[in-house]
């Protein structure tokens, strides 16, 4: 009786004992007050900002809405969350009581060879490894941090999808624009070629002029297939991200043209925003927390393990019309004390400490890389704006020069070479403008991704906008359903 009272008094003290190992504290690192080309105003919570809406492109909006539902990478990341949640249960299970039940029955001869003996019994066993030094509590703490890291990985998968999808859409529209430019130039050059043939018949042009005009026509025809190929490659990638047939996406894109232009404000916030908004920083911090908790797990293994165990076994015996019951029970503690292990347990502690130190370095590197990514993207966007404006003015100037050269050639005041050179310059300037628009749009994407905006944005696509993609998905699912 006294032993039970002693156990009842000591047990709460053992279970409430402190855990070994360091407690995790959120790491800190000095950051600049502002980005070199940014403002001093915080951007706030950018996670819910659907920045792709600033392109004012309904097709793009419907693709993003559909992609977040259908993308396999996002679904794969969600499955990792489920696995991490199960690991939390597994990590804490070792510190909980374990019960088992065994039922047995046997028949045999008794002491008298003419009698039969029937014995049936039930055994209920209970074991409880007391988490005196916090091994399983630290293990659970580590697993919970890993679960948080898995949730951050889902956010990473969502934003990676959005970045890939929007960038591929920008590329597809760029190649569409290039094809349109080349076809318009082909028409103009074909007209010049036809006019030159008429000039030859009238004796006002030479065979060399015809060959030069024809060469420019052939050159333009030759560049179109490559541009069409690149358009289709971009469309194929969009289809893969949306789990749609390529033909469906190509037909949707061919219904309209025009490069997406970002119309939103440039608001990169301040470096301190990145600690809150960048899920890769949050993921690195959670990985550090998990590694720190593992130090406590390793240190707890250096100390004795105390296990309480007990069992109760009622048995029923029947022989020659007589029967009776027997009750057996046992209860007691056991102590497992590590003495000689060749230094393995202490080496585990050192390994855990090194892993935690490496996790801190990884966190700090992630923070510094995040700041650089925003700095680079912000600088690129501001310069891209000037480049696009200059390219646009260049196109206007050269197109005006082409008109003057064409009119002068028609009047016989200048040579065909002047017209052909002006056409080449127009073609080059138009291609450069399209590339500048593409680069500006993609750098806006890069900036918004760098500040980690939009991964938790609500779906804003209306049913009318998303009807095409939704109908295509429904047809695919019905075609593959049994």
From Swiss-Prot:
Lipid-modified sites (S-diacylglycerol cysteine): 18
Gene3D superfamilies the record matches: Outer membrane efflux proteins (OEP)
Any single GO CC term annotated in Swiss-Prot or TrEMBL for this entry: plasma membrane
Localization in the cell: Cell membrane
Superkingdom, natural source: Bacteria
InterPro entries documented for this protein: OMF (IPR050737), OMP_efflux (IPR003423), RND_efflux_OM_lipoprot_NodT (IPR010131)
Family listed: Belongs to the outer membrane factor (OMF) (TC 1.B.17) family.
Name of this chain's protein: Nodulation protein T
Organism annotation: Rhizobium leguminosarum bv. viciae
UniProt gene name: nodT
């Amino acid at each position: 009786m006294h032993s039970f009272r002693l156990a009842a008094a000591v047990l709460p003290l053992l279970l409430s004992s402190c855990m070994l190992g360091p407690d995790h504290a959120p790491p800190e690192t000095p950051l600049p007050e502002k980005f070199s080309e940014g403002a001093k105003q915080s951007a706030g919570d950018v996670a819910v900002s659907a920045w792709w809406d600033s392109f004012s492109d309904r097709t793009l909006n419907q693709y993003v809405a559909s992609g977040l539902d259908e993308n396999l990478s996002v679904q794969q990341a969600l499955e990792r969350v489920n696995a991490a949640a199960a690991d939390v249960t597994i990590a804490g299970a070792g510190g909980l009581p374990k019960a088992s039940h065994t039922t047995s029955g046997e028949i045999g001869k008794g002491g008298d060879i003419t009698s039969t003996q029937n014995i049936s019994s039930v055994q209920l066993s209970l074991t409880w490894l007391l988490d005196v030094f916090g091994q399983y509590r630290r293990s659970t703490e580590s697993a919970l941090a890993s679960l948080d890291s898995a949730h951050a990985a889902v956010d990473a998968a969502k934003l990676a999808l959005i970045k890939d999808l929007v960038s591929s859409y920008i590329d597809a529209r760029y190649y569409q624009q290039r094809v349109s430019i080349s076809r318009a130039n082909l028409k103009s050059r074909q007209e010049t070629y036809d006019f030159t043939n008429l000039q030859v018949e009238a004796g006002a042009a030479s065979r060399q002029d015809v060959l030069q005009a024809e060469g420019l026509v052939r050159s333009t025809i030759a560049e179109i297939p490559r541009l069409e190929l690149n358009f289709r490659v971009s469309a194929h990638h969009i289809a893969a991200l949306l789990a749609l047939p390529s033909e469906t996406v190509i037909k949707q894109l061919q219904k309209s043209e025009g490069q997406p232009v970002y119309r939103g404000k440039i608001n990169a916030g301040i470096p301190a925003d990145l600690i809150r908004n960048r899920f890769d920083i949050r993921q690195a911090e959670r990985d550090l927390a998990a590694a720190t908790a593992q130090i406590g797990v390793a240190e707890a293994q250096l100390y004795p393990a105390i296990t309480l165990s007990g069992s109760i076994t009622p048995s029923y015996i029947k022989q020659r019309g007589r029967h009776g019951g027997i009750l057996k029970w046992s209860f007691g503690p056991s102590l497992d004390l590590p003495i000689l292990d060749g230094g393995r347990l202490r080496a585990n502690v050192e390994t855990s400490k090194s892993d935690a130190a490496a996790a801190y370095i990884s966190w700090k590197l992630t923070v510094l890389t995040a700041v650089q990514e925003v700095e680079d993207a912000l600088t690129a966007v501001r310069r891209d704006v000037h480049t696009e404006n200059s390219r646009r003015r260049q196109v206007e100037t050269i197109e005006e020069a082409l008109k003057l050269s064409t009119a002068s050639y028609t009047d016989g005041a200048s040579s065909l070479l002047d017209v052909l050179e002006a056409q080449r310059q127009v073609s080059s300037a138009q291609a450069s403008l399209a590339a500048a628009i593409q680069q500006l749009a993609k750098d806006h994407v890069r900036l918004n991704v760098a500040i980690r905006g939009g991964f938790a944005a609500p779906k804003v696509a209306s049913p009318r906008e998303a009807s095409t993609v939704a109908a295509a998905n429904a047809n695919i699912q019905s075609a593959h359903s049994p």
